[in-house]
Amino acid sequence: IRLGSDMGKLPAPFIDTATGDPTVLPMVFPSAPSAAMKTAAALTASWAGRLAYWRGADFPVYFNEAPAGEHFVVFVTNTARPTFLKDFPKVEGPQISVGDAPNSLAEKMLIVAGRDDADLIAAMKALGRGSSVMIGDTFKPAAQQEPERRKAYDAPRWLDTDQKVPFSRLIEY
């Protein structure tokens, strides 16, 4: 049974937090990805890794081809796209969509799209912040202000070992 394409279900089906298995999330690029496209992929890996947490994550890379039998992320601009998305409509800004993977009966693809490379980065930053409500098959983030830079050693899961750390801070239910 093919699932509907709904951004509201994210991170499913791309990340399964109900099992103890590591996340495997292939990244698909056009034949020659730009440095900014790779930055968007790094932001995607950071988002997925944060959600996979202790389960671990692996990000196999594909160029110009869709992986068989797996959900995956694909990066698309109006001028650079894998051939299997040659008919994907041009976009007018940062956009993330969920669609049916080609040649598959059940898998989905997360399409990170933009007019240019900067839009890809903007789309993934918006998704990574997780502050927007996403409904339907497409999310078009509005322009967002960059958050203030974090202080050194201020990461969300950082434990300050200069003081006592209660065991309860190490457990997540």
Each model region followed by its residue ranges:
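Solvent-exposed alpha-helical segments and adjacent loops
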Residues: 1-173
